[in-house]
């Protein structure tokens, strides 16, 4: 397939006010998507958003474009990305659209689409939408224009769905949990789910103002959560990102529990329950410690390219039901169709309750190898990965690791960054080697 002009690995994303995240482009995008999606029968689209101030502007633009193409929009208001996927399925809508830039700062935003079955749009549908964007906008006849409505009980519907993934025979009674909602889309969802299941809940990151999403909080910055868990003598902490599709946890000691460890816990529990179908999928970034721990359990493991859509594709290719990224995207197809931070967290909590074990104990069967990730910003027109000095630097680092570690360089799918990852047995060595490669990348940028 030819290279796409606008769609990246997770929809369309950028800085608000700069192409392509402008009101006029998003209106045209709504129209183009409407033209393509209307061919498939249904005429309703679910639109959700996170808590960014630009969400108001962009949802209005999307709705106008969809209406011009003859499709109606149903707004959920601030709602986690996986909630939009769920509501798209239950309403039998033709598609769901999420206005979010996930873990990015408030001044970024993006648009991503879900199919009628709650999975991300196939590449060929995204390509068809891009093809329509090159055509002049034409409006349907007045009698065929789309309408707008609001799903007033969207939050309640999703809360009940999340609770339904937690066994009826279990309770969270007696657990003290700190929930960090990143001032994002889970702020009015996650605390209610946990409280209704019996937990004592302390919240941070639940006062969104349109500009504080992901700011020093949430899954990408758990320092405040770690401190609060220890200060409150809580049993654990749960950190979601801005749109609620990621989860990072913190144990009672304040130690971080990442997506690799969460995947290990839920996979081992599924194995114990006789509900693990085949193996599990990680990514090129997944820690070697995960692979070794799963091997000890006899659980097959495969690595996909980085990106939750590629994890899901590999799961589907192999017929497996579980996968994750170490960043906290955890996909459990027996429960939902996409990464869902709340649902993933509930499966960990169920394992704790069922086995009468702490989060620390559940992690004890897996030892993470030291892994250092350095992000290097680069100018869009250059490609540091093709630079001879960078390639020589990587080769030298691999020689020093002598087969007892890994080196991975890749471009981010959502930002102009080169991600440098080095993994090995000694943290200081790994840190030094990662910085050596990062310096070479900077020089080439």
Swiss-Prot record:
It catalyses: alpha-D-glucosamine 1-phosphate = D-glucosamine 6-phosphate. It is an enzyme of class 5 (isomerase). Its EC number is 5.4.2.10. Mg(2+) binds at residues 102, 241, 243, 245. Binds 1 Mg(2+) ion per subunit. The keyword Ribosomal protein does not apply. Keywords: Isomerase, Magnesium, Metal-binding, Phosphoprotein. It holds the Pfam family PGM_PMM_II. Its cofactor is Mg(2+). Activated by phosphorylation. GO terms for biological process: carbohydrate metabolic process; peptidoglycan biosynthetic process; UDP-N-acetylglucosamine biosynthetic process. GO terms for molecular function: magnesium ion binding; phosphoglucosamine mutase activity; phosphomannomutase activity. GO terms for cellular component: cytosol. It comes from the Bacteria. InterPro entries: A-D-PHexomutase_a/b/a-I (IPR005844), A-D-PHexomutase_a/b/a-I/II/III (IPR016055), A-D-PHexomutase_a/b/a-II (IPR005845), A-D-PHexomutase_a/b/a-III (IPR005846), A-D-PHexomutase_C (IPR005843), A-D-PHexomutase_C_sf (IPR036900), A-D-PHexomutase_CS (IPR016066), Alpha-D-phosphohexomutase_SF (IPR005841). The modification Phosphoserine is found at residue 102. The keyword Disulfide bond does not apply. Catalyzes the conversion of glucosamine-6-phosphate to glucosamine-1-phosphate. Belongs to the phosphohexose mutase family. This is Phosphoglucosamine mutase. It comes from Edwardsiella ictaluri (strain 93-146). The gene is glmM.
């Amino acid at each position: 397939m030819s290279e796409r002009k606008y769609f990246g690995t997770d929809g369309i994303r950028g800085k608000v006010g700069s192409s392509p995240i402008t009101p006029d482009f998003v209106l045209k995008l709504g129209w183009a998507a409407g033209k393509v999606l209307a061919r498939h029968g249904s005429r309703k689209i679910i639109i959700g958003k996170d808590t960014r101030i630009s969400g108001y502007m962009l949802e209005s633009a999307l709705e106008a474009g969809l209406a011009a193409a003859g499709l109606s929009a149903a707004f959920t208001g601030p709602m986690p990305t996986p909630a939009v996927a769920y509501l798209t399925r239950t309403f039998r809508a033709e598609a769901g659209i999420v206005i979010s830039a996930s873990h990015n700062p408030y001044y970024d935003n993006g648009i991503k689409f879900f199919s009628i079955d709650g999975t991300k749009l196939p590449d060929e549908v995204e390509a068809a939408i891009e093809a329509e964007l090159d055509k002049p906008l034409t409006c349907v006849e007045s009698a065929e224009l789309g309408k707008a409505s609001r799903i007033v009980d969207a939050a309640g519907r999703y809360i009940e769905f999340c609770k339904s993934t937690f066994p009826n025979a279990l309770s969270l009674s007696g657990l003290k949990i700190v929930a960090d909602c990143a001032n994002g889309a889970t702020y009015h969802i996650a605390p209610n789910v946990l409280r209704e299941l019996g937990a004592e809940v302390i919240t941070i990151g639940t006062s969104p103002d349109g500009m504080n999403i992901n700011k020093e909080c949430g899954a990408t910055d758990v320092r405040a959560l770690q401190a609060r868990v220890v200060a409150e003598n809580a049993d654990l902490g749960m950190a979601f990102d801005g749109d609620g599709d990621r989860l990072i946890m913190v144990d009672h000691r304040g130690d971080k529990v990442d997506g690799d460890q969460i995947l290990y816990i839920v996979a081992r529990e599924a194995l114990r329950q006789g509900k693990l179908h085949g193996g599990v999928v990680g990514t090129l970034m997944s820690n070697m410690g995960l692979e070794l721990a799963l091997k000890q359990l006899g659980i097959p493991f495969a690595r996909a390219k980085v990106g939750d859509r590629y994890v899901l594709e590999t799961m589907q290719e192999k017929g497996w039901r579980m996968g994750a990224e170490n960043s906290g995207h955890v996909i459990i197809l027996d429960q939902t169709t996409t990464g869902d931070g709340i649902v993933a967290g509930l499966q960990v909590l169920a394992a704790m309750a069922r086995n009468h074990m702490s989060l620390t104990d559940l992690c004890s069967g897996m030892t993470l190898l030291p892994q250092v990730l350095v992000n290097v910003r680069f100018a869009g027109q250059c490609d540091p990965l093709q630079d001879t000095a960078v390639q020589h630097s990587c080769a030298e680092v691999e020689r020093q690791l002598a087969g007892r570690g890994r080196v991975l360089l890749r471009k981010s799918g959502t930002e102009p960054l080169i991600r440098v990852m080095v993994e090995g047995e000694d943290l200081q060595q790994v840190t030094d080697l990662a910085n050596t490669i990062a310096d070479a990348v900077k020089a080439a940028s």
